[in-house]
Amino acid sequence: MKKIVCFHLLNDYSGSPKVLNLILKGLSMKGYEIDLVTSRNTGILDELSSCKYVKMYRYRYLFSNNPLFTILRYLYVQVYTFAFSFRYIFRKNIIFYINTLLPVGPALAGRLMGKRVVYHYHENAFAKGLFYKTLAYMMQCLASNIICVSNFQRNNLKKK
């Protein structure tokens, strides 16, 4: 059975977790074994806990009114998911599925371990600030494949 390890920063009811929810339901119905690593927040991804082939791993992540706290929490999650990823170091044929630009820690770990790293790119990083542009650059360096939600996004990437 093929194994997919999926990383999504914030479980909520916004667009990217809704798309991810549909994709993972479809893959689990086809018999893929999926480990989903996401936040403990209540969100659409909670529906996947009833899927036969989906196992969920959760961490604490919250936004704050203080931008410094938010970035520190974000950095903590990147270190945590980077370290968490190494539980798959000896597993063959594992795909690391990175939903959005934000989970860069597990993408880096996957690349270091020689895993296939697939990004699902939802954001328009080039319309946002330096932080997102940096994440988009890192995505292009780390990804084996990039799934874009639009041709507009694809055309803004150097790695096609």
Go through each PLM region and give its residues:
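Short N-terminal targeting/anchoring amphipathic segment
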Residues: 5, 73, 84-103, 116-118
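N-terminal strand-loop element at the rim of the active site
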Residues: 6-14, 26-72, 153, 158
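Histidine-centered beta-alpha loop that forms part of the nucleotide-sugar donor binding/catalytic region
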Residues: 9, 61, 99-101, 121-124
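A conserved mid-protein helix/loop that constitutes part of the nucleotide-sugar donor-binding site
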Residues: 17-25
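An aromatic- and histidine-rich active-site surface loop
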Residues: 43, 77-81, 95-113, 128
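A conserved, positively charged/aromatic
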Residues: 69, 87, 118-144
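A short, active-site helix/loop in glycosyltransferases that binds the activated sugar's phosphate group
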Residues: 143-160
